[in-house]
Amino acid sequence: MLMPKRVKHRRVHRGRMTGKATRGNFVSNGEFGIQAMEPAWITSNQIEAARIAMTRFIKRGGKVWIKIFPDKPVTKKPAETRMGSGKGSPEYWVAVVKPGRVLFEIAGVPEETAREALRLAMHKLPVKCKFVTRETEMGGEANES
């Protein structure tokens, strides 16, 4: 499971997931990737499940990049606890994902294999995604250059 080694603050505010991703919204390392179409919190368990689904399908060929990292702690109070007495203890870690963010990248495999591997990963995630290549952008058109 992915989580930070050290954090400055153990508990953080929930925040808002407005707007589109301004960083990490194109394929940079690999040849193919999946891009989020809606905002969501993706937990470290979901990231790991998607990674395992991809790597099992491509077997030994290819390389996979995880482009998101769960750096936000989500707290939870114990069951049957009265309100008050402070914020709960950190329960799990999430990555805040906005529309347009590339979540996973893959290289070294044919496009059909990459498409199927990334499709399997998409089913493990709580966010609607689309398959993108190094040529396509958020709008879906290919670059002229």
Swiss-Prot record:
It comes from Ruminiclostridium cellulolyticum (strain ATCC 35319 / DSM 5812 / JCM 6584 / H10) (Clostridium cellulolyticum). InterPro entries: Ribosomal_uL16 (IPR047873), Ribosomal_uL16_bact-type (IPR000114), Ribosomal_uL16_CS (IPR020798), Ribosomal_uL16_dom (IPR016180), Ribosomal_uL16_sf (IPR036920). Residues 1-22 are annotated as: Disordered. Part of the 50S ribosomal subunit. GO terms for biological process: translation. One of its GO terms (molecular function) is structural constituent of ribosome. GO terms for cellular component: cytosolic large ribosomal subunit. It comes from the Bacteria. Residues 1-17 have a biased composition (Basic residues). Keywords: Ribonucleoprotein, Ribosomal protein, RNA-binding, rRNA-binding, tRNA-binding. Binds 23S rRNA and is also seen to make contacts with the A and possibly P site tRNAs. This is Large ribosomal subunit protein uL16.
